[in-house]
Structures are given as structure tokens and as C-alpha cells.
Amino acid sequence: AEEVDASDVNDIRALIRKAAPDIVVNAVDPRFVMPIFLACEEEKVNYMDMAMSLSKPHPEDPMNKPGVKLGDEQFAREANWIQNGNYAVVGMGIEPGMSDVFARYAEDELFSRIDYLAVMDGSNLTVDGYDFAPSFSIWTTIEECLNPPLIFEEGRGWYTTEPFSELETFDFPEGIGPVECVNVEHEEVVLIPMKVKAKQVRFKYGLGAQFIETLKTIHTLGMDKKEKVKVGNVEISPRDLLASILPDPSTIGDLMHGKTCAGTLVKGLDKAGKPKAVYIYNVVDNHWSMKNYGNQAVVWQTAINPLIAMELIANGSWKPAGINGPEWFPAQPFLDLIVEYGSSWHIREEDSKGIVI
């Protein structure tokens, strides 16, 4: 093991030169995507991540127009990667990642026309002793939930809306049940329209009413701010302070109960031209992942995807070049390996008329 400053490009470059890897897998906070990405570009080494470069709001109209979108900084440099003969596979976790693979599978195998595609994430996870304990980084939770959500529509392109907009209750499978979901900024809304033809794409997060109200309160109090403020003789970011107070998600697995679900809801016409709607999903039970792997459900559900992707690249099933998302590649080889890796994926038929666009 080596210690490295993930914000320092030169520090990361030195570690790459020392380790001489075939690929660098970035599994750290999205704040550090660009330093690691740039270090790999400069050292001409392949790269993979599970979240993309951060967005920046539109300077005049952030609730209607996107500014710098998630991943824009990375895709802007694709010519350099092609020239170097290297690849970067971006957004290769669970969401983004497996959810994008589901979208590609839906287009290839199930639909002749996609009218609506929504990545729907939800869980019934609880944590003993805590009323509010996010199952992954609170820094990232705040970033994606309080930024203006991104939506894609054919003919209009990408646009934004108010945080927590379009509340709906979605019935998640395998006993999770109904959870309140809202629009959230997420990488799939950038990646999927680049390769999958869909009339509308969005991401809806099953936060639940209490979680939503807590995040709204955090925002109202200014505790979501990234900029440092002076407290006595010390300067600290309110968001960093909040992250230090809340429990570390990697340490709460034994206290967690329930299941987490990641999936892609698709509505359109099937290959015969008839109305069709499905929810393609993956569910992980926290008791199962802790018992078998010693990792909580959200962590395990995320971590297997870059491993599967690297195996597919190694055996030639996926052939990345330049900067690619998961939907750049055939879906079936990935889905086959999900089962081999001890997990599963399922298709639930939905009522096409019940999905209002």
C-alpha cells in the first residue's frame, strides 16, 4: 500500500511511474477525478472510474440551463487519449455503470423505440442508532442531490430543473416497497443519450421523505457549502465538517439492515411495435453482502462493476478506445458475468399506461 495526495497530479504521476500499472482504477471521492484522470493522461496509462468530473452550474440560469455537465471536463480531452493510444472507461460503478448497461440492453434486445428512460434508485436500508446516516459519502450525496437535476429530451437536449422536483412514489422490487423518488443530477443522464436513442432520460433517487427534508435543512443552514468559512482562528468547509460528524459509510455495515436496488425503467415500443415497459434491476441484501464479503450492500454493489469491466476488456469482449461510458459496449457479456460474480439481474414487466411522461 502507498499513500498519495489524490489532489496532486504530480504526486499521482510519481506513484504511477513507480507502480507501472496497466490501468488505474479511481475509487475515491469525485472531487479527485480530474487530478487522477490528468495524471493517467500525462503518464499514458489506461483509466477507469465510478463517477465523473464534477458539474458547474450555469452562471445566469442554473435551474433551467446546464453549465458544465458531469464528465464534460473528461470528454473534452478525448483527442489526447486517442492520440496516446489509451482508453478511459468512465462511470463504471453501479449508478452510473450497471444502470447504463441495462439501458444498452433495453435498446439492443427489448425495444424498437424508447420514449422514456429513468434510472430509479431506492432502498429500505436502516442503520441502528442513527436517524440520518447515508450509506455512501455525504459529500457526494449533497453534491448530486442539491445540484440542479439534469434531464435530457429529444429535440431539446439537456436542461435542468429545481432540486427534489417531480416527486413520485415508485414501488421497488424484492420487498423494498414504495419509496418517494425525486429528480437528481447523475452521470447516466449525460452518458445514455450519447449512445442510446431515447426520447427522454432522467435519474430519480428514492431518498424518502425524511431524507429529503434533512437535505433541505442542510441546504437552508448553509451546511452544504464547499467554500471554507472562518470559525475563530480556523478555516473549514461546512460540508467537510458535516462529513466528519456523520458516521463513515465504510464502518456501518454491521449496523445496516435491508436491501438496496439500482435499476433502469424503460417505456416505449417492443421489437414488434407494441407498447412495452420494464424495470431492469439489481438488488443486494446487506445481510448477504456482509456475511459473504464483509462489505455493506451499497459498497459491494458498486465495487463489482469495474472488476467485471476489466475482465471483459482483458478477454477482448469490450474494446475501449478514447473515452467511453458503459453503454459504448455490448451489454450481454457484462450481464452474464454479473451472475458469475455472485450477484443477479432481473426484468420486471411494468404497466406501460401507468408511466406518465
PLM regions with names:
Residues 108-357:
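C-terminal catalytic/substrate-binding lobe primarily of soluble NAD(P)-dependent oxidoreductases
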Residues 24-26, 48-49:
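Redox-cofactor binding/interface segments in oxidoreductases and associated redox assembly factors
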Residues 2, 89, 202-204:
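General small-molecule cofactor/ligand-binding pocket signal
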Residues 50-86:
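Rossmann-fold NAD(P)-binding glycine/threonine-rich loop
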Residues 73-124:
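Adenosine-phosphate binding glycine-rich loop
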Residues 33, 53-61, 95-97, 124-127:
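Short gly/pro/ser/thr-enriched loop/turn and capping motifs at secondary-structure boundaries
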Residues 3-21, 28, 32-35:
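Conserved Rossmann-fold cofactor-binding substructure of NAD(P)-dependent oxidoreductases
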